[in-house]
Amino acid sequence: MGATLLFCMALLAGCAPSSPGPSKAGEAFKKEVLAVRDSLAPALMDAVAKREPRSTKKILEQSCALAGEGGNPFACGITILDSHGITLASATPGEPIKRLDYSRYEVVMTALKERKVVKTRLFLQDGTRLYVVAIPLVSKGESIGLLGLAFDASDLRNRFGLTEDEFMRVDLNG
């Protein structure tokens, strides 16, 4: 009797639904995030490690221009932070650099301390919903800065059909 009960419980556990796998929209979003990261991070590492705003801004502007010329402009806002959460550069064209302090933002400090990609959603004052991805820039096991990507949620829904739930389920650390 005990063996039969144990067998039935094992069978039921094996039949339990598994957590949903990544959706096509989630996979498309992940591919875009990784492409932006792979395009920007290697070029930025030295300037970010030295906390050089001018060099960081120049590299970011050149990378954005190259992506646009190649027919694949970055479809997100980009902010580069130093290891203390202070802005080194931003991809907003024509805007003067503002050394904003993001060190009080949990998403920023978590990504820097744990050296892993962290996602969150933010709401602007006008109601615009943003999906933010904080990617630590790591050199020799130490966080030297952060690559912050901000995507307009409605743009991602239009391009990929990505929902908020799918965004939150995307694993960018694997």
Residue ranges: model-predicted function:
Residues G2-A13:
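Bacterial N-terminal signal peptides
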